Amino acid sequence: MEYEKMKEHLKAIAIWGSLCVLFCVVLYLSTNSIVDNFNSYHRLYLECEKDIPQVPWMILFYESYYLLIFLSIVLVKSPHSIRSLSITLMVSSAIACTIFLLFPGEIGFSRTDNIQGFESLFEALHIIDKPHNLYPSLHITFSTISAFALIKQTKQKLFHALLILWVIMISLSVILTHQHHLFDIATGFVLAWITLKFVYLKLESARHWLANALTIIALFL
């Protein structure tokens, strides 16, 4: 029995984790490439934000976001929750990328690659991620969703506190690495709240696969 449960769990991770990564990466990079060829962009930041100093070592927290997502998919306790989490991340990605296409942003910071000790990380980041998929920040949205899914798995307060602290550090990192502005962070949290409330929690309460399917269809009607 335990072997069968483990087998189903690993199967859900492989199928839904792979589908989620493929969907989100392809959609984000495609949107990024399209928007990079636009002629006009929206500036949704305060001028005073441009005076915020860059803190190079915060890129370590910025990149740790990928680890948080990985852990959330691997550590949630049931195949059903893995499916709920993956679908929520994909819906969030679809909503965000639609906004990126309709309202492409312009970042107020000047990008610098020659940062001693972190050159390769910043160079790779700037090559892959063009400065227009800004709001909502998917770093914020995905981190919040992932942390929430993990928090729902346990009642350990210390674990909850560490996850919340991790999300806070990622939130600080997106602006201290000069990748996002305050508006991007705020809208990232808003998108996370919307998709957690109307997608993740709905899916978690619908245990039957047919109820899951009907719930997703209803979300888009």
Annotate each PLM feature.
Residues W16-G17, I69-F100, L163:
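Interfacial segments of alpha-helical transmembrane regions
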Residues L27, T31, V35, I95-I99, ...:
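Alpha-helical membrane-inserting segments
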Residues M6-A12, V74-S86, I151-F159, L201-L210:
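Membrane-interface helix-boundary motifs at transmembrane edges
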Residues H9-G17, V21, S84-L85, L163, ...:
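Residue-level signature of transmembrane alpha-helical entry/exit and packing/kink sites
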Residues K77, F103-I107, T177-H178:
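Short helix-capping/hinge motifs at transmembrane helix termini and TM-loop junctions
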Residues F122-N212:
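Membrane-embedded catalytic cores of phosphoryl/pyrophosphoryl-handling enzymes
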Residues E2-L68, G105, T112-F118, F122, ...:
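N-terminal transmembrane-helix/juxtamembrane module of multi-pass inner/ER membrane proteins
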Residues V25-V26, S93-L101, L165-I175, A218-L221:
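Aromatic-anchored segments of alpha-helical transmembrane domains
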